[in-house]
């Protein structure tokens, strides 16, 4: 675990065979859809807003799900590979996870982006957010924490 700033850490090579799942998803023709963002805070409505977030998404099942198939296998292996990292993070920062949201598999094409945003929100309180890169051979895609003046290129 490498700390980049208070509470912002990097783990590398946590899920070495992750690209096998991407290959299977592509071979099976599993559909990607446009990712959504909160578009009306007062009524808690989500929708597509490509000016804020322009990316493709596959929603994965929860790691406790009884579903079967490629996406369920990916979720379970993802969770099993990352759980030791989360445990180490929680022990280091005295953090606690009360529930896991379903993971999202995101795909960014050329010119796609997710602008500056905060993951914590009154409707969906997030104390720990996790980003995992399934590959490293891409252009752009730096992660930036503007409040810390921190920008880095993630590795899988």
Regions found by a protein language model. Name each.
Residues 1-90:
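Non-heme Fe(II)/2-oxoglutarate
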Residues 68-156:
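Catalytic core of non-heme Fe(II) oxygenases with the double-stranded beta-helix
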């Amino acid at each position: 675990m490498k700390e980049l700033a208070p509470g912002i850490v990097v783990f590398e090579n946590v899920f070495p065979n992750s690209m096998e799942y991407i290959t299977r998803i592509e071979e099976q023709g599993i559909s990607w859809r446009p990712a959504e963002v909160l578009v009306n805070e007062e009524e808690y409505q989500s929708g597509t807003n490509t000016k804020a977030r322009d990316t493709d998404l596959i929603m994965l099942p929860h790691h406790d799900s009884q579903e079967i198939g490629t996406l369920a296998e990916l979720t379970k292996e993802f969770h099993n590979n990352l759980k030791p990292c989360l445990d180490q993070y929680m022990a280091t920062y005295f953090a606690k996870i009360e529930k896991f949201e379903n993971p999202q598999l995101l795909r960014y094409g050329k010119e796609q982006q997710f602008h500056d945003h905060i993951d914590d929100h009154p409707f969906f309180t997030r104390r720990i957010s996790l980003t995992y890169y399934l590959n490293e051979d891409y252009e752009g895609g730096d992660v930036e924490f503007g409040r810390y003046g921190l920008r880095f290129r993630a590795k899988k």
